[in-house]
Amino acid sequence: ANAQNCTLVSGMCHSLSAIFRYSLNMTDELSTMQNEMGHVRNYLYVMDVRNGATITYDYQIDSETLQDRLPRICLQPVVENAISHGLRNTRRKDKKLLIRSEHIGDNLVVTIADNGIGMDAQAMNELLEKNDRKRVESGVSIGILNVNARLKKIFGEQYGIHIESQAGEGTTVTITVPAIAEKNENSESENNGG
């Protein structure tokens, strides 16, 4: 038991320090899919230690997308919402979270889907479409609305987040951005992700 606690504490320290390092590194507003996934995996490890490993994760990350550019910390808030609002409140025993990345045409499409309680997707999509930047910039809006506003600001109004959901079945959040690979293919991964 003691050895297990040491491993757990060591893993938790590693993940937390990686999360802080990644979050505080503001040298570039863009990162890569690989680094974003490293950040998400560290976050999910911390959540598993905190809440117990009650969720099954399915990562379907196309290796062709790993060097594609994304705004820093754009996947983790969506994953956090899926856990906090979708999966935490469901009574199902088979909680699942899917994270998929793929190229569709000239775009990088990232899908984050849960089998949680679902939500009012129409109302949320209306808020996303409205893209109230003043609300986001004032700090009133955080999470998915903030991520959507950043995606639209960086890549254009045609990009961003779309949500589909069914009550009792789960929610699927789709992030669409242009597929732009990082110029330096040999870039060092910040988070050991991928």
Regions found by a protein language model. Name each.
Residues A1-E164, G170-T174:
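Two-component histidine phosphotransfer core
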Residues I163-G194:
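C-terminal end segment of the histidine kinase catalytic
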